[in-house]
């Protein structure tokens, strides 16, 4: 497999890539880094919202208007929900609680909780759960939260939002709404059953919560939301004909009535060109063609939500549009801009800015409330409006009366500062010297569009062809699916000593940064395409020991919690696994490079780890 991938780096061949027949668990769309990572979780691109890999919505709508008829080909019009009873991230709440098992009926309104303590929510391990306001690290907790509701909610759609680590059972006025079993998740939504909505009353209500902390982190938080009027403007969908995942791009084909539409999401992650690989701009290419021989009037509508630049949808965002050079830009970001202000697992970026851009010729744009934007597009004149900090971005490409037309959008993110490395904030690799702007990156991406797309097509064809020869068709399709995912699971930055740092983010484990046992299974890809990136997977672990910041005689597990690389935060060491991983990867680097220079540079610490393994390797503590 490695040999097949390696030869794909060679001179481009004039080969048309065969379509992948794989039905992927999720389809990669915009792949830049662990934060700007957008996927389709559904078979058809229009069957559900575009999402971040954590499962939270990255709203992105795509609609074709053909001779006045609407066809939605991407995303869905998202549910708009208003806070009714706030979570700890939306406002302050207090409750009675106990960590000792109460008598039966504790979830009912008439239960006497006078002997229980009072605390502020959320409840959890405050050292590693930023929303926890009351320390709870014991095995169990029972909580009774009184909530005042002013509105009559009969007949409304009401949702419970909850975060839990681990098992949680939640009642609303004595009606069980959620029983999670053994799991730990954040910002989940559960629609209240009719019985629970019927039990809601104007005045005082009771939310009763049980949570079991099985191990490590603990957290419990919840609130209620009510659905706004959710009129749908784009009910008719296109018909998806195919989807095809290649290494650099994901291709879709649709029929929109008398017009066929092709879409390609491209992230040019070429590991032999680090400036291009880290350029934080992906392409969305469209191609329309009449399927009945006649000309048709075609407009394409693209709408992105502020969630691309927010951790939580209730955060306040600021949106704007502007032109620079030949590009029209739309931009959104959080109002607060706390750079590197959040760390953790199920967390998205809320500093920096998301951009959507296109050629300013035949483009129009607007920002504002989603329904207003959509209706104005249907009515033929895109119109801006204002919201309370949740403006959406809308971009329309007018293709005119045509039999065939094509073009592209640019989607990107400027994270300003990417990683904190032992107290120092580091810029992204593409702006490592602080002399680049995001607009210059977009301008380069636009100018180089044709050349980059040709290069991507050649790479995709070669990878699929040669991986098929080595491992068969299904193996090749897996290689193509894994390619962008594996690279974009990392962030590349330059250390103060000019070392490359290629830092991974753990997902749905604990959010660690630069974890050795995450590095180990992904390393073959980087050893094949650029051994300097393989070193970038190890440099921080060597530095951590060689600097004396980590003084144990074995390799660390990680260097922090993403994106803060200030030292190991994982609770347990894994000395045998991590030391063995580092030794094997260093040896593999020597084999690929044909010399042991990298090992020589780190010989002292490698010797320390080897001595540890010689003494304890066959009899590990744990």
Predicted features by range, described:
Residues 136-150, 189-192, 249-252, 393:
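Short beta-strands within extracellular/lumenal beta-sheet-rich domains
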Residues 116, 139, 147-174, 207-209:
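Aromatic-lined ligand-binding clefts that engage carbohydrates, nucleic acids, or primary amines
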Residues 432-453, 511-620:
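Aromatic-rich carbohydrate-recognition surfaces in CAZymes
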Residues 83-103, 108-111, 116-118, 183, ...:
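An acidic-aromatic loop/edge-strand motif
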Residues 5-7, 12-28, 37-38, 43, ...:
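Acidic/polar, glycine-enriched structural segments that form the non-catalytic walls/loops
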Residues 44-47, 71, 293-297, 419, ...:
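Structural helix-adjacent loops and short alpha-helical linkers that scaffold large soluble proteins
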Residues 37-42, 62, 66, 254, ...:
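Well-ordered alpha-helical scaffold segments within catalytic/enzyme domains
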Residues 49-81, 229-239, 519-560:
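Carboxylate/His-rich catalytic cores and anion/metal-binding grooves
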């Amino acid at each position: 497999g490695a040999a097949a991938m390696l030869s794909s780096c060679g001179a481009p061949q004039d080969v048309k890539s065969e379509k992948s027949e794989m039905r992927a668990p999720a389809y990669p769309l915009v792949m830049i880094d662990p934060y700007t990572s957008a996927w389709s979780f559904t078979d058809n691109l229009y069957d559900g919202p575009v999402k971040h890999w954590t499962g939270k919505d990255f709203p992105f709508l795509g609609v074709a208007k053909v001779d006045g008829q609407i066809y939605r080909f991407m995303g869905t019009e998202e549910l708009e929900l208003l806070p009714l009873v706030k979570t700890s991230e939306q406002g302050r709440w207090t409750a009675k609680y106990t960590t000792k098992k109460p008598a039966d009926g504790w979830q009912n309104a008439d239960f006497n909780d006078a002997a229980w303590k009072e605390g502020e929510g959320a409840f959890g391990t405050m050292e590693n759960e930023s929303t926890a306001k009351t320390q709870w690290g014991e095995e169990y907790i029972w909580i009774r939260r009184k909530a005042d509701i002013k509105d009559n909610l009969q007949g409304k759609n009401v949702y419970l939002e909850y975060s839990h680590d681990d098992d949680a059972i939640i009642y609303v006025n004595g009606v069980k709404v959620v029983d999670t079993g053994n799991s730990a998740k954040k910002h989940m939504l559960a629609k209240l059953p009719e019985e629970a909505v019927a039990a809601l009353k104007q005045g005082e209500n009771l939310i009763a919560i049980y949570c079991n902390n099985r191990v490590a982190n603990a957290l419990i938080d919840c609130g209620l939301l009510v659905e706004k009027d959710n009129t749908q403007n784009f009910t008719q969908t296109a018909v998806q004909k195919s989807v095809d995942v290649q290494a650099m791009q994901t291709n879709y084909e649709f029929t929109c009535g008398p017009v066929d539409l092709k879409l390609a999401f491209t992230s040019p992650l070429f590991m032999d060109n680090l400036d291009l690989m880290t350029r934080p701009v992906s392409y969305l290419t469209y191609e329309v063609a009449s399927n009945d021989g006649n000309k048709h009037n075609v407009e394409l509508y693209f709408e992105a939500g502020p969630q691309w630049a927010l951790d939580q949808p209730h955060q306040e965002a600021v949106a704007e549009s502007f032109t620079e050079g030949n590009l029209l830009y739309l931009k959104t970001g959080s109002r607060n801009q706390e750079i590197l202000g959040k760390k953790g697992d199920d967390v998205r970026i809320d500093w920096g800015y998301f951009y959507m851009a296109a050629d300013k010729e035949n483009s129009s744009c607007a920002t504002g409330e989603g329904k207003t934007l959509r209706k104005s597009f249907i009515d033929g004149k895109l119109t801006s409006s204002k919201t309370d900090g949740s403006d959406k971005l809308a971009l329309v490409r007018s293709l005119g009366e045509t039999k065939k037309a094509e073009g592209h959008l640019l989607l990107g993110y400027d994270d300003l500062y990417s990683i904190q490395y032992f107290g120092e904030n580091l810029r992204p690799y593409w702006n490592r010297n602080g002399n680049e702007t995001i607009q210059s990156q977009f301008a380069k991406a636009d100018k180089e569009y044709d050349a980059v797309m040709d290069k991507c097509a050649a790479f995709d064809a070669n990878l699929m062809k040669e991986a098929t020869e080595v491992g068969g068709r299904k193996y090749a399709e897996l290689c193509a699916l894994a390619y962008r995912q594996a690279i974009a699971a990392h962030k590349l930055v330059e250390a103060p000593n000019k070392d490359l740092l290629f830092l991974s983010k753990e997902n749905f484990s604990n959010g660690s940064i630069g974890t050795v046992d995450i590095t180990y299974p992904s390393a073959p890809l980087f050893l094949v395409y650029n051994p300097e990136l393989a070193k970038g997977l190890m440099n921080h672990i060597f530095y951590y020991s060689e600097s004396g910041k980590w003084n144990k005689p074995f390799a660390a597990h990680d260097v922090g919690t993403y994106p803060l690389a200030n030292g190991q935060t994982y609770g347990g060491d894994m000395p045998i696994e991590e030391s063995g991983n580092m030794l094997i990867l260093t040896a593999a680097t020597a084999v690929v490079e044909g010399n042991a220079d990298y090992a020589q540079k780190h010989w002292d610490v490698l010797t320390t780890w080897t001595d540890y393994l010689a003494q304890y390797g066959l009899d590990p503590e744990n």
